A protein has these predicted regions:
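Nucleotide-activated chemistry modules centered on ATP-dependent adenylation/adenylyltransferase
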Residues: 1, 16-300
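Short, glycine-rich nucleotide/cofactor-binding loops
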Residues: 2-9
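Hydrophobic positions on the alpha1 helix immediately C-terminal to the Walker A/P-loop
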Residues: 12-13
């Protein structure tokens, strides 16, 4: 089973699995309401050209978007950088449904195209959690770590009671499936195959892979949430996940600092069309939200 989101890394991972490993996978997509139309089209392109089946598990998209609305309203009443991640809490049930598909298909092997350079310690760092540089996975798991994380999140939530809404069960159950359930036959393909951005972009062009019209980067363009939360981080903290990603590339020796600075100067430009789509989708007023974010006092 290969998870595919329509993003760059999962699409390239599928290419490797079929063409290099010579496997015949089934792909799985969890549509929680924030997979963009562009992402869906890229999933269709990859699966069609590689001749693989795509199983789509769709959540109650209306419910998921209403949950985002409730939590975003709570966040805007008391902005906290450590709570930005609650806006993406709804996608964690991905981990629940992949186990269902494994049982139904009789396939135990689960391969993910997760890029090890995309780890972002700062997101939980804004809650007061120090980075674990020995962490083996992009997404941390384990009961003690998660209990501490949820306790710090609860403290932040107490500053805006709007967080205590009907989305709580969805959020907590998603975290349970992501962090507490035992995963078996679960591997990240880029732990074994070198991740090379230039080669990935070149390969995806062979599939007529579609780019977003409002940015030059190929990262996160199938994710409807990324443009908005990166706008928050850039406005308030002065950097985004693009900065941490490029910093990790420097540490790996993939690019130099001058190249990284040139890239993030472009990648950190606000993606207003995508932000507008996101806020419309969750039923929020675009101008009102942007004005509220812009009024937040920067921390730098």
């Amino acid at each position: 089973i290969v998870g595919i989101s329509g993003g760059r890394d999962s699409c390239y991972g599928l290419h490797l699995i079929v063409n290099e490993l010579k496997l015949e996978p089934i792909t799985y997509t969890y549509d929680w309401g924030m997979v963009t139309d562009l992402g869906r089209r890229n999933i269709s392109r990859m699966c069609s050209k590689l001749g693989v089946e795509n199983i789509i598990v769709a959540a109650d998209i209306g419910l998921k978007r209403r949950n985002i609305n409730k939590n975003l309203r709570a966040w805007l009443r008391s902005p906290h950088l450590g709570m930005v991640s609650i806006l993406t809490a709804g996608d964690k049930h991905f981990f629940k449904h992949v186990e269902t598909i494994k049982r139904q298909t009789g396939i135990s092997l689960n391969l993910w195209g997760i890029n090890p350079l995309e780890v972002t310690h700062f997101k939980s760092g804004f809650l007061g959690i120090k980075p674990d540089f020995e962490e083996k996975l992009v997404y941390s798991n384990g009961a003690i770590k998660q209990m501490r994380y949820q306790l710090l999140r609860l403290c932040a939530m107490s500053k805006s009671l709007g967080y205590f809404n009907t989305s709580i069960w969805d959020t907590l159950s998603g975290e349970y499936y992501r962090s507490f359930t035992q995963k078996s036959d679960y591997f990240h393909i880029f732990d074994y195959w070198r991740w090379d951005e230039a080669d990935i972009d070149k390969t995806l062009r062979l599939y007529d892979w579609e780019m977003a019209p409002d940015t030059h980067t190929t990262w996160r363009i199938g994710d409807g949430t990324a443009a908005f939360y990166n706008y928050i981080y850039y406005t308030v903290a002065g950097f985004t996940e693009h900065d941490t990603f490029r910093s990790n590339q420097i540490r790996e020796g993939d690019i130099n600092r001058e190249e990284a600075l040139r890239l993030v100067a472009d990648e950190n430009r606000p993606r207003y069309p995508n932000i507008k789509w996101y806020l419309d989708a969750v039923g929020m007023d675009y101008e009102e939200v942007i004005k509220t974010v812009n009024k937040i006092k920067p921390i730098y």
